[in-house]
Design a protein with these regions (language model features):
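Residues at alpha-helix caps and immediate loop-helix transition turns in enzyme cores, especially N-
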Residues: 8, 31, 61, 84-85
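Core dinuclear metal-dependent hydrolase active-site scaffold
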Residues: 11-13, 120-150
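Active-site metal-binding motif and surrounding structural segment of the metallo-beta-lactamase
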Residues: 30-77
Length: 151
């Protein structure tokens, strides 16, 4: 939060590029691009983003990454907020006030055609990498962890 270069994302390479678990906040877009470049990757190589939940530090750059071509995967309860983040942003603005932009940057809506709503136990395979969405409510009422068998 507000630390230059700090991103709450995990990168996993696959046969056609890479996927991310978490997008990180919108304020870290430049740092994310730089870290990808260090690994010989471009934004266009990010095929998918799997969100654990929709809090701004975990999902804030999801809409931006969707506009670069990534498919965004999320819990059913989080999907409406990614399509229309106004309620989420209004709530966060009451907490963070003038620090919203500095901490979180821009939070763009995810286009519906780029959004994948996952169910508990659902297995998704991307570029030969399979993962299973496992509902773990607690930190948020719309929380997943992802189980990777081959990573």
């Amino acid at each position: 939060m507000g630390v230059a270069g700090s991103i709450a994302s995990y990168l996993i390479r696959h046969a056609q590029g890479c996927l991310l678990v978490e997008s990180g906040p919108g304020s870290t877009q430049a740092a994310l691009q730089a870290r990808l470049a260090e690994h010989g990757l471009r934004l266009a190589d990010v095929s998918d983003v799997f969100l654990t939940h929709i809090h701004l530090d975990h999902a804030g750059a999801a809409g931006w990454l969707a506009r670069q071509g990534a498919r965004i995967h999320v819990h059913p309860a989080g999907a409406p907020h990614l399509l229309d983040p106004e309620k989420l942003l209004s709530s966060a603005a009451r907490i963070y006030g003038d620090l919203m932009d500095t901490l979180w940057g821009q939070f763009l809506p995810v286009p519906e055609e780029q959004l994948s709503v996952l169910q508990d136990g659902q297995v998704v395979t991307v570029g030969g990498v399979s993962l299973q969405a496992v509902e773990t409510l607690g930190h948020a009422e719309h929380h997943f962890v992802y189980l990777f068998d081959d990573v």
